[in-house]
Amino acid sequence: MKKTIYKCVLPLLICILLTGCWDRTEINDIAFVVSSAIDKKKDQYRVAMQIPLVGQLGGQTGGGGGTAGSKTWYVDSASGTTIREANNKLQTSLSRTINTSHRRTVIIGEDMARDGVAPVFDILTRNPQNRLTALILVSRGEARDILNTDVQLEQFPAEMIRELAIIATSRPVFLSRFMSDLVEIGSDPYAPVISASKTKPGGKGKSNLKIDGLAIFKKDRLMDIFKDEHMTAALMLLNQARQPEFIVDLPNQMGQASIQLQKSNASFHAAEKNGKLSMTIEIRAKGIIMENQSTYETRENDQYYIIQKALNRTIKKDVISTVHRLQKLKADPAGFQDRTIRSTATTKNLLKKEWEEVYKDMEVHVVPIVTIEQGGVLYKTISH
């Protein structure tokens, strides 16, 4: 009889142990944040969050960018003397619990970045719920406006921001990477810049987002935003350029050629000369002629090599100009200091000096070794 009772009671006791849903949180009670924007106005931080409206996603037709004629996302913002206070104020206005474990992008406003991003990264890295693989971007103007931009190709702006951040550099700038450059000695952080724009289809333009430069930091402060040739050259120094293109002015005013680099790699050699740092930058790349608006032929002959030499001159000029601009800013995203410390061709006397003084007086030598692999199917230009 006792054995029978034990056999009946034991399964019941096991069932009690298996009921592990007492502290459950229903998915309908959670607000999943996909992107955040942080701005600063005077002594106030303003935090904006973008939350997808799940009920509006999928199974519907019409509307731009995969929407059903109504927004598939919701943006709310709040201000506070600290970022945490702003987050708490946001929570009081939401009927669901904020969850940032699915956040994929964080946008920092330009004014906030110039004032210093240390408070942002303190809260982003201290809470284990936050993802260290979130992508970091800096906005032109206010970051909140980026989240409020109606995009045409994606269901919500956060996805467009993420895709743009990924294609901006060959290796995306994650939160963890930015923090590593910020904390460690030897290099400064950088991040892509995003801005809102209008399309120009011929009538009333629609809103859109675009990558609008490269943010250069000195420690935690934004120093400058590089665009055009300086952005391209900086990305090549960082080995972050994704198929950069150069418009090359050819000799004797014979026109221009557009050349795309398929593979590029920058290597550095630090040495000491006459008590000063000498940095040799070797750039190796292979290119393709994408457009030829000159009288030069693009088959392998003397004219072909003239175009190749002109490309090497252009790259050398742009890289030297970019390094000099970085020296004036006292910013070192390329890690010249780290390469100097690791070099066996520098003395202890040089390393004992203040880095900013060494960096300011650094001599730069650029050695481009760029070859054009393809001139295209058409050797001669039609217009000439």
Curated annotation (Swiss-Prot):
Predominant location: membrane
Q: Which PROSITE patterns has this protein been placed in? A: PROKAR_LIPOPROTEIN
Q: Which UniProt keywords apply?
A: Cell membrane, Germination, Lipoprotein, Membrane, Palmitate, Signal
Instruction: Provide the membrane topology annotation.
Output: Lipid-anchor
Subcellular compartments: Cell membrane
Positions with an attached lipid (N-palmitoyl cysteine) read C21
Give GO BP annotations, semicolon-separated.
Answer: spore germination
Asked if Nuclease is a keyword of the record, the answer is: no
This protein's GO CC annotations: plasma membrane
Please report which positions carry a covalently bound lipid of kind S-diacylglycerol cysteine: C21
Matches recorded under InterPro entries: Spore_GerAC-like (IPR008844), Spore_GerAC-like_C (IPR046953), Spore_GerAC_C_sf (IPR038501)
- Signal sequence bounds: 1-20
* Entry similarity comment: Belongs to the GerABKC lipoprotein family.
This chain's function reads: May be involved in spore germination.
Q: Which PANTHER family match?
A: SPORE GERMINATION PROTEIN B3 (PTHR35789:SF1)
Name of this protein: Putative spore germination protein YfkR
Q: Which organism is it from?
A: Bacillus subtilis (strain 168)
Lineage of the source organism? Bacteria, Bacillati, Bacillota, Bacilli, Bacillales
**Coding gene?**
yfkR
